[in-house]
Amino acid sequence: MERRTTMTSMMKGFVLIAFASLFLVPVYGQAAEPEKHDAKASKLDTTAIEKAIGKAGELKDEVYKISMPRTDLKVMVKDVTLKPGLALGSWVAFKQAGNEAVVDGDLVLTEDEVAPVFDKLRKEGIEVTALHNHLIGETPRVMFLHVAGKGDAARLASHIKAALALTKTPLGELARKPGEVSTKTGAEEAGFNAEQIQQVLGHKGRVKGGVLQVSVPRPEPIKMEGITLPPSMGMATALNFQQAGEGKIAATGDFVMIRDEVNAVTKALAEHGIMVTALHNHLVHGSPELYFMHFWANDTAEKVAKGLRAGLDAMKVKPATN
């Protein structure tokens, strides 16, 4: 009888331990173990992602990124009509991490789209890591919703598509893969001297849809819950330029900074007539802790480029080109 009682107590103990262990499994949104490289890890299923989202993407450095510009919107800042590639580009980026995929992204939404998309993402298990403005004084008002998730790639993509379906974001049939090189030179397609801007910045970019896009990666690895996020997953300073009338350009984007760089960059931009329009986070559980500073400039190409170069210098970013 005593032996039976002892066995019963042991079994109850095992059940309690097993039950408690269910709450110790790390999920996206809680502390996780450091990233591991499993030789048997599955490969990112880009075909399944394409089919789920309804649009093709671009694979680079093990990241599959799908761009979804809001070409349906006509947004103006004062008298400047924004090209989609300047400040209206929704995107999601997928990366394989062990036997699961991780996703993060930035969804461009009108004010009336925010509530239904936010609610749908929550119900589908996709995390919202930030909701904020990037611009000031734009019409109509545009908001930016940052998302993150971890799990099966196709399932993550289908959940995001379910939220996008509540917006007017153009998707349609599977699109041709982006990144095709225009037959025009950068200056011809952009309508301004894109090469001059790149020389001043000390970093090369690309012209797409009439917009010069320059990406400047941070020097240190960026992680979220132990998973490394490459620059293409929104972890690089983004500087975008478009023509804005005779002899002028408009520029916007965001500086990706650690806390000790924030005040120095703010000062550098202000001294060159560049307006800071937002300062906030994009991630939760990020390491190091990052701050994203958005800006707006409308002046000659040379003046704007010099101002943004001063911002990069304040971050002690080394030029990539001469």
Segments predicted by a language model, with ranges:
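Long, contiguous binding/interaction regions
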Residues: 32-141, 148-290, 294-322
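Bacterial N-terminal signal peptides that target proteins for export
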Residues: 2-17
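Boundary at the C-terminal end of the N-terminal hydrophobic targeting segment
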Residues: 27-31
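Bacterial N-terminal signal peptides
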Residues: 14-26
